[in-house]
Amino acid sequence: MDPVNFIKTYAPRGSIIFINYAMSLTSHLNPSIEKHVGIYYGTLLSEHLVVESTYRKGVRIVPLDRFFEGYLSAKVYMLENIQVMKIAADMSLTLLGIPYGFGHDRMYCFKLVAECYKNAGIDTSSKRILGKDIFLSQNFTDDNRWIKIYDSNNLTFWQIDYLKG
């Protein structure tokens, strides 16, 4: 199953979606293992949506299909607490329009996810890089509170039984 259909079928609101693209303006400067992340907002007017922060557009909401245009690989993670995930998804909308960057009043993709979950009561550790606290994909994927439910590089990994309860 491709990641878009998997997310539409199984992923709860607030799931975090890591993707790698064939071409990225920032991939060579990014020490993160996974190069981009977004929060699955869920559906609105029958459209599946993702909130992300990009170099050119800052924090924005895009259709799930567009989020995956040109992707090479994808992973989807969730928490056990679905209510917390819904709060984080709702929080993501309050950050729309913030410009991209690493300053106090700026937002890059991993910081977006960390901020949304911080406001939902889930703190994320950061890495100290060049005197700044920076969030990377590893801060989520190495945290055992996050459960990987999809990996496009390991399609036998799906934890659909976990999602069904």
UniProtKB/Swiss-Prot annotation:
Q: Which InterPro entries match?
A: Papain-like_cys_pep_sf, Peptidase_C92
SUPFAM superfamilies documented for this protein:
Cysteine proteinases
Q: What is its main location?
A: virion
Q: Which GO terms describe its cellular component?
A: host cell cytoplasm; virion component
Q: What Gene3D superfamilies does this protein map onto? A: endopeptidase domain like (from Nostoc punctiforme)
From the Swiss-Prot or TrEMBL record, state where the protein is found.
Answer: Virion; Host cytoplasm
Would I find Zinc among this entry's keywords?
A: no
Q: Which Pfam families match?
A: Peptidase_C92
Arranged from A to Z, the UniProt key words for this protein are: Host cytoplasm, Late protein, Virion
Q: Does the keyword Ligase apply?
A: no
* Further details from the record: Displays sequence similarity with a group of bacterial permuted NlpC/P60 proteins. Thus, the ancestor of the OPG091 gene might have been acquired from a bacterial source at the onset of poxvirus evolution.
Q: What does this protein do?
A: Contributes to virulence in host but not to replication in cell culture.
Family stated for the protein in its record: Belongs to the orthopoxvirus OPG091 family.
The protein, known as:
Protein OPG091
Q: Which organism is it from?
A: Monkeypox virus
| Lineage, highest ranks first | Viruses, Varidnaviria, Bamfordvirae, Nucleocytoviricota, Pokkesviricetes
Q: Which gene encodes it?
A: OPG091
